[in-house]
């Protein structure tokens, strides 16, 4: 007899109800909980999944390259990136009539296609690709890489090739390898690609597999490198009137510090980018020699942490300091994952900021829809990663934290001071919430009663001061970099011309701000602090609280501990994650609304609309949401359809998915159990239907599972709705 799913849990496999299926899916990746799991086996399985992950990423990249080469218009776009719309892929089956077929036959295509808003065209062009053949080659290369990664994943599950537990626990060697080899070498290798391929292509000099060994990236060759005369590589940069992709105005420099943007492409100078990657690569290679391994040189992280104690009598004494942290972190995969997710979350948010403020890809700043899509995409990913970081932090406290091993160290002190931490976050959230909402509501009321001059408008003077210190002249502060003859400006003379031109020019670096920005900044701060409050409380209370001191014994996710201890519902660490996701989505909504509306106003040359309407609530509802929905909603109507029709449909569908979430969030398990029992009864008493039997007795989802289904619908619907709105409202205006 075939083994029932799930094979990793005999207890679940023998469950006679449909709980077997849903719990099996829910715990499939919780390797720690599987039957017969050892610590070594756990690490080995996780190690192999990393190769699977890499294979999926490689396959995805390969698919993008392949479809753009096959069905896109890359070569036409390269010839005129400002006027040709990039094609993502063909639409094979537009079965909605001739009107729609005509509407989606766009961007010079002869059949229906989708427009690309991914920025991939800009990236491929910037890094030196100009032909479909090169895209195909890249696609095949990534396919081979994926196959290799899959093989590596399989290989490391074979008995002979499974790394030992000691190998996984060797933190210093792993850090050195990741820093020097993965980060360091790959950064230097990327510099090599930019210098040898991308920069020559940007100057009209083709470099490919046919000639890369014979084309010198710099006329002086390697001579200056070996003689230490490195300044030669920065001489003769591209001129301010260089035409990207041609010899016109091109220089010979390969590593520069120009600052600012290429006037035609409005992207960072490629030679500046190459310099950046070389510098950061060298730093990482040095960092990768920092930790002591079997060579006996460098630092021992454990020694550093053990001795990291403040002198006795220091105010705010840290107790045992960082004692015990090395083993605590090194023995907890959840702690490590929490740190990794938090770091990646911050980096992803920074990527969102930098991709629009300091774009590195040629002409991407002129593709408004792509800029908006990429900003929004990266901020949404950032909130997901940050919520995950705290979730795994909480799991660490429940499964991995050892109070004895961490006696009186900084981790134990966090737990001891949790009341102070949580109550301060609560106070900040309340303060921000009441004051910000109070200002918005006041302004809304006075505008509604026809006296807009009675609004309370606060200039963000401190933020304006920071912008002025960075060189923005519009406010007249005359401080630091905006003080032309000052010491700060002189000290940074190397890149000052380019930077000052950028910050005071028509770019996205430090946009002018006013009272509307001040208010929405504090609304976003409210969202961030409230999300943080929920997440931090969930992690710090994960082991127990005054209400439920034995909470850790119930695990990460539990619905309640029955009616006998009234009030134990909704307090598991999982519930904190669940509640935080709603606030995180709320926050990223305000953040992306702000970014998008401010940019729509700038791009359309009507900054007054944002400045005047963003100071009261109805301004946001009417002049941002309602006004920008109109084109979208008319994507299809009784009179026909246009090329926004697909986004109109997605907008409606997103609302449907989102609203479905409430069905699971509002009704509890008993309702569904009764409904299921009634449906089973009806099946059993109906002809034909009664021929069908259930191998598993149908039962309702658990409370926690129903919540996760509700949360998934809410989140996915939220994302689909806003994505459709964002893309349609931007592309409908700017094409």
From Swiss-Prot:
Cofactor binding mode and count: PSI electron transfer chain: 5 chlorophyll a, 1 chlorophyll a', 2 phylloquinones and 3 4Fe-4S clusters. PSI core antenna: 90 chlorophyll a, 22 carotenoids, 3 phospholipids and 1 galactolipid. P700 is a chlorophyll a/chlorophyll a' dimer, A0 is one or more chlorophyll a, A1 is one or both phylloquinones and FX is a shared 4Fe-4S iron-sulfur center.
UniProt xrefs under Gene3D superfamilies: Photosystem I PsaA/PsaB
An MF annotation (GO) of this entry: 4 iron, 4 sulfur cluster binding
GO CC terms, sorted: photosystem I; plasma membrane-derived thylakoid membrane
Chain positions recorded as [4Fe-4S] cluster binding sites: 560, 569
Protein residues bound to chlorophyll a B3: 663, 671
GO terms for biological process, alphabetical: photosynthesis
Pfam families registered for this protein in UniProt: PsaA_PsaB
Top-level class of the enzyme under EC nomenclature: oxidoreductase
Keyword Thylakoid among record annotations: yes
EC id: 1.97.1.12
Main location as per UniProt: membrane
Reactions accelerated catalytically: reduced [plastocyanin] + hnu + oxidized [2Fe-2S]-[ferredoxin] = oxidized [plastocyanin] + reduced [2Fe-2S]-[ferredoxin]
Metal-binding listed as a keyword: yes
Topology versus the membrane: Multi-pass membrane protein
Binding site for chlorophyll a B1: 655
Family under the similarity heading: Belongs to the PsaA/PsaB family.
Function: PsaA and PsaB bind P700, the primary electron donor of photosystem I (PSI), as well as the electron acceptors A0, A1 and FX. PSI is a plastocyanin/cytochrome c6-ferredoxin oxidoreductase, converting photonic excitation into a charge separation, which transfers an electron from the donor P700 chlorophyll pair to the spectroscopically characterized acceptors A0, A1, FX, FA and FB in turn. Oxidized P700 is reduced on the lumenal side of the thylakoid membrane by plastocyanin or cytochrome c6.
Name of this chain's protein: Photosystem I P700 chlorophyll a apoprotein A2
Natural source organism: Synechococcus sp. (strain CC9902)
Gene that this polypeptide is encoded by: psaB
């Amino acid at each position: 007899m075939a083994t029932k799913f799930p094979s990793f849990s005999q207890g679940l496999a023998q469950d006679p109800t449909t709980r077997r299926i849903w719990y099996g899916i829910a715990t499939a990746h919780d390797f720690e909980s599987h039957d017969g799991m050892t610590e070594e086996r756990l690490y080995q399985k996780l190690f192999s999944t990393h190769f699977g992950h890499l294979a999926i990423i490689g396959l995805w990249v390969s698919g993008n390259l392949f479809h753009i080469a096959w069905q896109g218009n890359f070569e036409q776009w390269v010839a005129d990136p400002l006027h040709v719309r990039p094609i993502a892929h063909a639409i094979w089956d537009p079965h909605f009539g001739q009107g729609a077929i005509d509407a989606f036959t766009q961007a010079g295509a002869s059949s229906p296609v989708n427009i690309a808003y991914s920025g991939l065209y800009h990236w491929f062009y910037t890094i030196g690709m100009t032909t479909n053949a090169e895209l195909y080659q890249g696609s095949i290369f990534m396919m081979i890489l994926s196959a290799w990664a899959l093989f590596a994943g399989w290989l490391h599950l074979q008995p002979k090739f499974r790394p030992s537990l000691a190998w996984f626990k060797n933190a210093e060697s792993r850090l050195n390898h990741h820093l020097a080899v993965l980060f360091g070498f790959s950064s230097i290798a990327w510099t090599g690609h930019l210098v040898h391929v991308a920069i020559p292509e940007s100057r009209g000099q083709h470099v490919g597999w046919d000639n890369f060994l014979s084309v010198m990236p710099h006329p002086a060759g390697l001579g200056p490198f070996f003689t230490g005369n490195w300044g030669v590589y920065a001489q003769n940069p591209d001129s301010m009137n260089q035409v990207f992709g041609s010899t016109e105005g091109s220089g010979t420099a390969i590593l520069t510090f120009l600052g600012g943007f290429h006037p035609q492409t409005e992207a960072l100078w490629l030679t500046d980018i190459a310099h950046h990657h070389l510098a950061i690569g060298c730093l990482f290679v040095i960092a990768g020699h920092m930790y002591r391994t079997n060579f006996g040189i460098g630092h021992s992280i454990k020694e550093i942490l053990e001795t990291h104690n403040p002198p006795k009598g220091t105010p705010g004494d840290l107790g045992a300091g960082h004692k015990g942290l090395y083993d605590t972190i090194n023995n907890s995969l959840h702690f490590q994952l929490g740190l990794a997710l938090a770091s990646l979350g911050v980096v992803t948010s920074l990527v969102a900021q930098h991709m629009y403020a300091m774009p590195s890809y040629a002409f991407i700043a002129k593709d408004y829809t792509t800029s908006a899509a990429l900003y929004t995409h990266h901020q949404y990913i950032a909130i997901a990663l940050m919520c995950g970081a705290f979730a795994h932090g909480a799991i660490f406290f429940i499964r991995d934290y050892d109070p004895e091993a961490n006696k009186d160290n900084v981790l134990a002190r966090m737990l001891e001071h949790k009341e102070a931490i949580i109550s301060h976050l609560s106070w900040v959230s309340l303060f921000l919430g009441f004051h910000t909402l109070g200002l918005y509501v006041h302004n809304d009321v006075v505008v509604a009663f026809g006296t807009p001059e009675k609004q309370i408008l606060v200039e963000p003077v401190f933020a304006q001061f920071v912008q002025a210190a960075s060189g923005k002249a519009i406010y007249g502060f005359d401080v630091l970099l905006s003080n032309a003859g000052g010491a700060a400006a002189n000290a940074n003379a190397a890149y000052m011309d380019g930077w000052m031109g950028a910050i005071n020019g028509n770019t996205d670096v430090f946009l002018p701000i006013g009272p509307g920005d001040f208010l929405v900044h504090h609304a976003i701060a409210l969202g961030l602090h409230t999300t943080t409050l929920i997440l931090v409380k969930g992690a710090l209370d994960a082991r127990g609280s005054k209400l439920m001191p034995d909470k850790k014994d119930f695990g990460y996710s539990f619905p309640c501990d029955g009616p006998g201890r009234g009030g134990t519902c909704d307090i598991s660490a999982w519930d904190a994650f669940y509640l935080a996701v709603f606030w995180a989505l709320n926050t990223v909504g305000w953040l992306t609304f702000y970014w998008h509306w401010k940019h729509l106003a700038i791009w359309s040359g009507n900054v007054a609309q944002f400045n005047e309407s963003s100071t009261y609530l109805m301004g946001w509802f009417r002049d941002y949401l309602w006004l920008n929905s109109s084109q979208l909603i008319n994507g299809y109507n009784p009179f026909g359809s246009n090329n926004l029709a697909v986004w109109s449909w997605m907008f409606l569908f997103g609302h449907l998915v989102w609203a479905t979430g409430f069905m699971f969030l509002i009704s509890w398990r008993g309702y569904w159990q009764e409904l299921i029992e009634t449906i089973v009864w009806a099946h059993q008493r109906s002809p034909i239907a009664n021929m069908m039997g259930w191998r598993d007795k149908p039962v309702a989802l658990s409370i926690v599972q129903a919540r996760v289904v509700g949360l998934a619908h809410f989140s996915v619907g939220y994302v689909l709705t806003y994505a459709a709105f964002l893309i349609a409202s931007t592309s409908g205006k700017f094409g």
